[in-house]
Amino acid sequence: PVLVDVTKDVTGAKYEYNACTPAAITPKVDTIKDKDIETAVQMIKDAKKPFIFTGGGTIISEASKEVTELAHRIDAPVCDSLMGKGGFSGEDPLYTGMLGMHGTKTSNLGVSGCDLLIVLGARFSDRVTGNTKTFAKNAKILQIDVDAAEINKNIVVDASVVGDEKEVLKRILAEVPEMRHPEWTAHISE
């Protein structure tokens, strides 16, 4: 252990400095495979009870607009992780709150009852999943993440797309039609 003791006069002093902002890392778009997009689009089209789980990747990718457009296009409720807070508006009628042990009953029951869980830039931490054997056991899981190491890491998924979330969603949105699930969204909003 090391102790760095900074005196009060130094911490309270005013000084000039030049802020150093690291350059953002731009993920490669060419990692996105056409067949993975096709699979994702088909899973979304086949879903009767879709649910979106968004995480910190939405924030990093600046994909809030695309997540909102997808949610409204496919009529899917949206929950988030702590790292995903702000990636989808808390004022939106499709928003259900956080998922997991610190989450809402609506989000947790929604994930338990959905037939397709679309995971956007979120890892499956133990605070979100609880028992991994029973997490979203009735759902197919589609995971979209820039980090291939996160795919199937804690939860085995049915399909995945590796790539920048914003770019992946743009490609999915180009192919997904307007869909309505009135019974499902009514059930979630109860």
Predicted segments, located by residue:
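Conformationally flexible catalytic loops at phosphate/diphosphate-handling active centers
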Residues: 1-46, 182-185
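Short internal beta-strands
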Residues: 3-5, 75-82, 142-145
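Short beta-strand segments
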Residues: 3-7, 53, 119-121, 145
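Glycine-rich beta-alpha junction loops
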Residues: 6-12, 56-58, 148
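Short acidic, glycine/serine/threonine-rich loops at helix termini
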Residues: 13-19, 62-66, 89-94, 128-132, ...
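Phosphate/pyrophosphate-binding active-site segments
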Residues: 19, 42, 47, 138-190
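Anionic-ligand anchoring segments at beta-strand to alpha-helix junctions in alpha/beta enzyme folds, i.e.
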Residues: 32, 41-117
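Phosphate/diphosphate-binding loops
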Residues: 100-151
